[in-house]
């Protein structure tokens, strides 16, 4: 929620971001709200993160890649880009990626399906971009982070990097789709007007585990939860930038207005403390799952 997509909040994929559809990541230091508006969660203090989608370059791009990663993750990636028209004014860039199998973490399986399409126009004084993407990830027995009991006197050493200490039976399905556009127009050599708008729809479901280290020997307790979530976000930004000089001092001012609407439907259930079971961060993967109780919302349809 705190990551921008080409300067627009609310349209970047939630939770897991696959870099195969992006050209670069920009770390914006300083008061970025003056340029891109305030982050939705209000936590982007002192800077921001901006994802720039892949777009067609002056040189044609045709790339087909296959890969194999430990332990048995295999897949392929197709990247295609062309420019055409007078002075290469128009550009199109497409990316497709598929990956499936066990990751380098023991017994963690991931399936990824990624697709993106970008169109851009660059005229003498006007620039237009349209970006669309779909990001789907299915994770089975994913390794999560751990919490520490506040009264621990020492923090246990980290286990082997490939060891999966998470409870068996956990899974997560995440699906994101977005489309957005941006227009920039140079009114003259000193003034530029811009506008951007986009929308994103996200669906997430899963059964999660929350391991907590309670002993210096690596003993842990496991709680659990199931969460169903659907988000629809609409975002827009418009403004102008002006450059001028006073003597030897050069100035650049930005004035803009941003809008963001997020509709979120959620339902969940958590395991009571009495149903938590124990394990060890160094030991074998725990089997079973704590019983869930006290559901909130409709787990079959969180919109109800």
Give residue ranges: language-model regions.
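Outer-membrane beta-barrel translocator/receptor signature
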Residues: 20-23, 32-115, 121-127, 177
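Outer-membrane beta-barrel transmembrane domain signature of Gram-negative proteins
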Residues: 59-79, 248, 257-304
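Acidic/polar loop-and-plug regions of large Gram-negative outer-membrane beta-barrel proteins
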Residues: 99-103, 116-186, 199-231, 275-303
């Amino acid at each position: 929620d705190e990551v921008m997509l080409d300067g627009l909040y609310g349209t970047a994929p939630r939770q897991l971001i696959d870099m195969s559809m992006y050209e670069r990541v920009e770390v914006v230091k300083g008061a970025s709200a003056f340029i891109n508006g305030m982050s939705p969660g209000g936590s982007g203090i002192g800077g921001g993160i901006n994802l720039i989608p892949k777009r067609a370059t002056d040189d044609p791009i045709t790339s087909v890649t296959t890969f194999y990663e430990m332990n048995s993750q295999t897949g392929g990636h197709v990247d295609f880009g062309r420019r055409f028209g007078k002075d290469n004014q128009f550009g199109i860039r497409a990316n497709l990626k598929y990956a499936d199998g066990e990751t380098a973490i023991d017994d963690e399986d991931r399936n990824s399906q990624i697709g993106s399409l970008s169109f851009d126009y660059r005229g003498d004084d006007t620039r237009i971009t349209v970006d669309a993407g779909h990001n789907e990830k299915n994770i089975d027995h994913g390794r999560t982070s751990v919490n520490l009991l506040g009264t621990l006197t020492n923090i246990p050493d980290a286990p082997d990097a490939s060891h999966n200490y998470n409870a068996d039976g956990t899974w997560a399905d995440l699906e994101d789709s977005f489309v957005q556009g941006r227009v920039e127009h140079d009114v003259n050599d000193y003034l530029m007007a811009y506008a951007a708008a986009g929308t994103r729809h996200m669906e997430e479901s899963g059964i999660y585990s929350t391991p907590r280290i309670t002993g210096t020997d690596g003993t842990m307790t496991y709680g659990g939860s199931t969460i169903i979530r659907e988000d629809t976000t609409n975002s827009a930004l418009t403004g102008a930038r002006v450059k001028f000089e006073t003597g030897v001092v050069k100035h650049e001012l930005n004035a803009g207005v941003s809008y963001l609407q997020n509709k979120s439907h959620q339902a969940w259930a958590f395991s009571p403390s009495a149903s938590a079971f124990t394990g060890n961060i160094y030991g074998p993967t725990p089997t079973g799952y704590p019983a869930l109780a006290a559901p909130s919302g409709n787990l079959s349809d969180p919109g109800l």
